[in-house]
Amino acid sequence: MEEKKKEEVTEDKIFRALRKQLLATPYSAPLHYNLGLAYARREQLDESITCFQQAIVYDPKLVEAYINLGGIYLRKGNLEACIEANQKALEIDPNHPLAHSNLGFALIQEGKLDEGMAGYQKALEIDPNQAAVRTNLGGAYFQKGDLESAIRENLKALDLNPSFALAHNNLLHAYRAKGDLEAAKTHCEKATELGFQVNPEIAKELGCR
């Protein structure tokens, strides 16, 4: 608890320092960008959007501002604006893996499964060592009914991060759908051990502790 209070005090000091610096240099894209990040951490999303937009005004090539702007729009449920922001990021840097993976995620939320998977695949082509993206791609394969590919991608995610609870949960569902209940139980227990809230009915069915 004491450590958390110290972090909050430090965060507040940084926030106030950024605002003070911005008064002195109001046309600084990095300051607007960093203040946008600070507002996002404080859950002040509208203010965060304004700061990222101002950062883009002063530096139209600041790709990270577009990506973070897209992330805020996603948190607000504005998928169209999220997609547009990440597409603009990719116009600046076509090989930015985070922009591709974020775009893929938003497209899947819109129901565009194949387009979203293409975004994940492009992100992994650029940087194969992204456990979260492999897990998301595995989840998309599961939605398509391709269980072997779903299992493959989630196992690759665990190669990168053996403690990735979501990958274990995804594998429990893929193995269960495949009929391999022993493997499903193993991953159910691992996901639970790592703190993931596994579906209680499925956990009971598998005898998962």
Q: What do the PLM-derived regions correspond to, one by one?
A:
Residues 30-41, 64-75, 98-109, 132-142, ...:
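Conserved alpha-helical positions within TPR/SEL1-like repeat arrays
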Residues 176, 181-188, 198-202, 206-209:
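Alpha-helical protein-protein interaction modules
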Residues 64, 97-98, 131-132, 165-166, ...:
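Boundary/linker segments of alpha-helical solenoid repeat arrays
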Residues 6-20, 42-54, 75-88, 109-122, ...:
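Structural signature of tandem alpha-helical TPR/SEL1-like repeats
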Residues 2-38:
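N-terminal segments that cap or nucleate solenoid repeat domains
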